[in-house]
Amino acid sequence: MLEKFAYKEALLAADFRLQTFAQLQKDLERAQCEFTLHPANFLDDLSKLLENLSSEKRAQLLYLIDLPEKNDAIVPTSNYYDGLAEQIIHREALKVFLRNKFSSQ
């Protein structure tokens, strides 16, 4: 229970958001997605990118980000790409949180 609280607290920190943004950009580069995200509105930018990617490129990106396929089923159908972008950002944030938590131990 404490871990969930610590994760939610971390999401609010500006430095944590910047680290999450950097992790997302790193994974976009690894997937060879040439797209510029802006820290202020990277959720909207990511949603637009996902919508414009080919299905092959999108699958490659999701694989590199390590987003479990079961998460795809819980993305709301009303705006699929916004929901998928949120799932990606949560996954990237979790990577940053775990890296910070275990690198300090």
Write out the residue ranges for each language-model feature:
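Short terminal alpha-helical segments
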Residues: 1-36
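General structural signal for secondary-structure boundaries
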Residues: 13, 41-42, 68, 98, ...
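Charged, alpha-helix-enriched surfaces in structured cytosolic catalytic cores
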Residues: 19, 41, 79-83
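Short, contiguous, helix-prone interaction/anchoring segments in small proteins
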Residues: 30-60
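Amphipathic protein-protein interaction modules
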Residues: 49-86
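Amphipathic alpha-helical binding modules
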Residues: 74-105
